[in-house]
């Protein structure tokens, strides 16, 4: 893999730091009037999603990470692992429940997700930006009950709970933004 000097650090670059993959979110090169130049770097740990801020000397260099974002179809959950398949090679990957994390509530059969692989091992799963799911449970919206926010909680067929308008009923299909967890529209 390529080696990157701290001068080459750019937003989006994926590197190995302390034997783990990180994605650089921002890098600021600082050249003080006195002393050695350095780079102030904000990066995200890909295994956990935590953010770290580090300072590197201008002479420091790090290895590039062998990290690949791949489109894969979600197949099923066997209780212990989530199974994904590459749509062209039909190669299947098992992903641990802790790796899928909060994304699990947005997964539907055959949904195309972005699976991040590090050395061929899945480390993160991003669900599609929007899903269409049926409402399995919600309170009936009473006519004239518009005091307050004008929304009510609804449980989707995936198990996720989202806030929907009062006019939405059980059995209707709604479109939801998985990045924010917000209702977008009804699907006709």
Curated annotation (Swiss-Prot):
<dbReference type="InterPro" id="IPR013185">
    <property type="entry name" value="Transl_elong_KOW-like"/>
</dbReference>
<keyword id="KW-0648">Protein biosynthesis</keyword>
<dbReference type="InterPro" id="IPR008991">
    <property type="entry name" value="Translation_prot_SH3-like_sf"/>
</dbReference>
<comment type="pathway">
    <text>Protein biosynthesis; polypeptide chain elongation.</text>
</comment>
<keyword id="KW-0963">Cytoplasm</keyword>
<keyword id="KW-0251">Elongation factor</keyword>
<dbReference type="InterPro" id="IPR020599">
    <property type="entry name" value="Transl_elong_fac_P/YeiP"/>
</dbReference>
<dbReference type="InterPro" id="IPR012340">
    <property type="entry name" value="NA-bd_OB-fold"/>
</dbReference>
<protein>
    <recommendedName>
        <fullName>Elongation factor P</fullName>
    </recommendedName>
</protein>
<dbReference type="Pfam" id="PF01132">
    <property type="entry name" value="EFP"/>
</dbReference>
<dbReference type="InterPro" id="IPR001059">
    <property type="entry name" value="Transl_elong_P/YeiP_cen"/>
</dbReference>
<dbReference type="Pfam" id="PF09285">
    <property type="entry name" value="Elong-fact-P_C"/>
</dbReference>
<dbReference type="GO" id="GO:0005737">
    <property type="term" value="C:cytoplasm"/>
</dbReference>
<feature type="modified residue" description="N6-(3,6-diaminohexanoyl)-5-hydroxylysine">
    <location>
        <position position="34"/>
    </location>
</feature>
<comment type="similarity">
    <text>Belongs to the elongation factor P family.</text>
</comment>
<dbReference type="GO" id="GO:0003746">
    <property type="term" value="F:translation elongation factor activity"/>
</dbReference>
<dbReference type="Pfam" id="PF08207">
    <property type="entry name" value="EFP_N"/>
</dbReference>
<dbReference type="GO" id="GO:0043043">
    <property type="term" value="P:peptide biosynthetic process"/>
</dbReference>
<dbReference type="InterPro" id="IPR015365">
    <property type="entry name" value="Elong-fact-P_C"/>
</dbReference>
<dbReference type="InterPro" id="IPR014722">
    <property type="entry name" value="Rib_uL2_dom2"/>
</dbReference>
<dbReference type="InterPro" id="IPR011768">
    <property type="entry name" value="Transl_elongation_fac_P"/>
</dbReference>
<dbReference type="InterPro" id="IPR013852">
    <property type="entry name" value="Transl_elong_P/YeiP_CS"/>
</dbReference>
<comment type="function">
    <text>Involved in peptide bond synthesis. Alleviates ribosome stalling that occurs when 3 or more consecutive Pro residues or the sequence PPG is present in a protein, possibly by augmenting the peptidyl transferase activity of the ribosome. Modification of Lys-34 is required for alleviation.</text>
</comment>
<keyword id="KW-0379">Hydroxylation</keyword>
